[in-house]
């Protein structure tokens, strides 16, 4: 081996790099207003009351396995809103809005990780799409729930989430981080 040659030994398997906005940058770009804050805060309080059996309604978190198309999600949301109105005395309906795929080792990784469904992994675009969809749902007066898979994801969207879950398979990831 030549003595004067530079050998690259760092990040030898990285093909591409894309900028991911810092959470505060995206929150400043897509802020929530007082009405959305009121919806999220109020729904969190209602969920707490239901879980502590101080509210007789049933909490229903319902929606698709994962979101891949915001327009379809909004169409689904409009149907849920009708049910939320019809059953408001018996149910508190929260739309399940999962953006990441926890059990997928191959294939699509979810809207946040691969918003274009083509393995380009434009995470910056994905977190922006996720945040915008949540704002649109809140403007429809529909609370949203999601599963948090990685410690960074909540930093972008937790202010618009009324109900959150950490899946059984994901606990170790939070501990390791």
In which residue ranges do the predicted regions lie?
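Residue-level signal for pocket-adjacent positions within structured domains
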Residues: 42, 62, 103
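A short helix-to-beta-strand connector/capping loop
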Residues: 55-56, 89
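Glycine-rich anion/phosphate-binding loops
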Residues: 67-87, 120-132
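Active-site-facing alpha/beta catalytic cores
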Residues: 2-11, 90-177
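Short glycine-rich or small-residue beta-strand-to-loop segments that form or flank ligand, phosphate
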Residues: 57-68, 94-98
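N- or domain-start disorder-to-order transition segments that initiate the globular core
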Residues: 10-54
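Long, contiguous hydrophobic alpha-helical segments, chiefly transmembrane helices and signal peptides
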Residues: 47, 61-64, 76, 144-145
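N-terminal beta-rich core of secreted/periplasmic extracellular enzymes
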Residues: 36-49, 81-94, 100, 130, ...
């Amino acid at each position: 081996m030549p003595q004067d040659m530079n050998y690259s030994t760092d990040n030898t398997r990285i093909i591409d790099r894309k900028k991911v906005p810092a959470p505060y940058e995206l929150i400043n770009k897509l802020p929530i207003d007082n009405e959305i804050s009121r919806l999220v805060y109020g729904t969190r309080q209602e969920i707490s009351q239901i879980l502590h059996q101080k509210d007789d309604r049933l909490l229903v978190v319902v929606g698709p396995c994962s979101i891949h198309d915001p327009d379809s999600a909004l169409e689904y949301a409009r149907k849920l809103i009708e049910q939320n109105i019809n059953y408001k005395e018996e149910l508190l309906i929260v739309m399940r809005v999962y953006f990441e795929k926890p059990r997928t080792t191959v294939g699509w990784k979810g809207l946040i990780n691969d918003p274009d469904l083509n393995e380009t992994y434009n995470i910056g675009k994905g977190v922006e799409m996720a945040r915008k969809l949540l704002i649109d749902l809140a403007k429809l007066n529909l609370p949203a729930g999601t599963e948090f898979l990685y410690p960074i994801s909540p930093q972008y969207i937790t202010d618009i989430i009324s109900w959150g879950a950490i899946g059984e398979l994901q606990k170790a990831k939070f501990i390791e981080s």
